[in-house]
C-alpha cells in the first residue's frame, strides 16, 4: 500500500478501458454509406447465411456491420445509421445497422420487438390481412 507521501508525489494510476466500438468515436450512432453488401457464414454450431455490409462512416473509417431482421433493401451507396453491438457468431462484426432510418426500410410483418426493427404498428396486421386475401 502506498504511503500518503507517495500518493502526493505520484497519485493513483487511472484504469484505461478499451472501447468495444472504437469506430464510433464516443458517439451513440454514426451515419455511413454502404460500399459492399454480402453474406457471411456464422461460427461453428450455427448454420445460415447472415447478411453483412461494409460501411464507410462519416468519420472516414470502414467497418463491417450486421443487417438484422428478415430481408433488406440495402445495396451499394445506401445511406445507413449504425450502432455498436456485434453478433456473437460472426467474428469481426462489432456493429449493427439501425432498421427504419435513412435508406434502410423496416422489417415487414414484424409484430414483436418492432422498435428494434423499424416496423410500424399497423403494418404487421395489414401484411397478415393481405396474405389471407391472396389465399
Swiss-Prot record:
Question: Which residue intervals are annotated with compositional bias (Low complexity) in the record?
Answer: 124-135
Sorted alphabetically, the Gene Ontology BP terms of this entry are: translation
Picking any one GO molecular function of the record gives: tRNA binding
Segments for region (Disordered): 114-135
Please list the residues that carry the modification 3-methylthioaspartic acid. 89
Q: Which SUPFAM superfamilies match?
A: Nucleic acid-binding proteins (SSF50249)
State the GO CC annotations.
Answer: small ribosomal subunit
Identify the stretch annotated as signal peptide in this record: none
What Gene3D superfamilies would the database entry show? Nucleic acid-binding proteins (2.40.50.140)
The chain's disulfide connectivity reads none
Q: What does this protein do?
A: With S4 and S5 plays an important role in translational accuracy. Interacts with and stabilizes bases of the 16S rRNA that are involved in tRNA selection in the A site and with the mRNA backbone. Located at the interface of the 30S and 50S subunits, it traverses the body of the 30S subunit contacting proteins on the other side and probably holding the rRNA structure together. The combined cluster of proteins S8, S12 and S17 appears to hold together the shoulder and platform of the 30S subunit.
Q: Kindly give the PANTHER family that the UniProt entry links to this protein.
A: 30S RIBOSOMAL PROTEIN S12 FAMILY MEMBER (PTHR11652)
Q: Write the protein's name.
A: Small ribosomal subunit protein uS12
Native organism is Amoebophilus asiaticus (strain 5a2)
Amino acid at each position: 500500500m502506498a504511503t500518503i507521501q507517495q500518493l502526493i508525489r505520484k497519485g493513483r494510476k487511472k484504469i484505461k478501458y478499451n472501447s468495444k466500438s472504437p469506430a464510433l468515436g464516443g458517439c451513440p450512432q454514426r451515419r455511413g454509406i454502404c460500399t459492399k453488401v454480402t453474406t457471411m457464414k456464422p461460427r461453428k454450431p450455427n448454420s445460415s447465411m447472415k447478411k453483412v455490409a461494409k460501411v464507410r462512416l462519416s468519420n472516414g473509417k470502414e467497418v463491417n456491420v450486421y443487417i438484422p431482421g428478415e430481408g433488406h433493401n440495402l445495396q451499394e451507396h445506401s445511406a445507413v445509421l449504425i450502432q455498436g453491438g456485434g453478433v456473437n457468431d460472426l467474428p469481426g462484426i462489432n456493429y449493427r445497422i439501425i432498421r427504419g432510418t435513412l435508406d434502410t426500410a423496416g422489417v415487414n410483418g414484424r409484430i414483436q420487438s418492432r422498435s428494434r426493427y423499424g416496423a410500424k404498428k399497423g403494418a404487421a396486421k395489414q401484411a397478415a390481412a393481405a396474405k389471407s386475401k391472396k389465399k
